[in-house]
Amino acid sequence: MILSDWDIRVYIEKKLLIIDPLFDDTVRENGVDLRFGDEFCRFKRENSVVDTSRDGVDNVLECYRVRGDGFVINPLEHVLTTTLEYVEFPHDLVGLVNLRSTFARFGLYIPPTVIDAGFKGNITIELVGSTVPVKVYPGQRFLHLILARTSSPVYKPYTGKYQGQRGVTPPKLDNSSSKNF
């Protein structure tokens, strides 16, 4: 069941759902709006190959802390960014992340993203650029997070490798299963 603004406010007031900072316009009719943080990472324009079975992406990412000048997402470029808000999910809520339609109308796109029950941290999001350069700014509301209640609290809440992440978090490889297809 998707939570209404009323249900979301109850979760927040009972401190079952943490959103920090929480703005007056965060809670919407059927979800919450989240803002761009000030960190953006883009892939270096090199011909090096990232081997997903053993390489991290630290050597191929260029990361920036952006202030009032904004950040330009180039045509068809894949960019990692983060939410300003730190969130903590209870064991009976999951989040479905959507790009706000204003940014989709500029041609930006995000892949389907699910926030697991029990997750804590800033949300790292991949943005895919439009056919034209698009400039975005820290603090702009860019995501709409739909909250859904599970039929019961999950047996094993999220405790994975991205738990507690702050800012943009590049992919983390689990080398123990990297070549097991």
Swiss-Prot record:
Presence of keyword Nucleotide-binding: yes
Q: Looking at the record, which segments are called Disordered?
A: 160-181
Biochemical pathway: Pyrimidine metabolism; dUMP biosynthesis; dUMP from dCTP (dUTP route): step 1/2
Matches recorded under CDD domains:
trimeric_dUTPase
Residues binding dCTP: 100-105, 116, 158, 165
Which of UniProt's keywords are assigned here? Answer: Hydrolase, Nucleotide metabolism, Nucleotide-binding
Presence of the UniProt keyword Oxidoreductase in the record: no
Q: Which reaction does it catalyse?
A: dCTP + H2O + H(+) = dUTP + NH4(+)
Q: Which PANTHER family match?
A: DCTP DEAMINASE
State the family it belongs to.
Belongs to the dCTP deaminase family.
* Entry protein name: dCTP deaminase
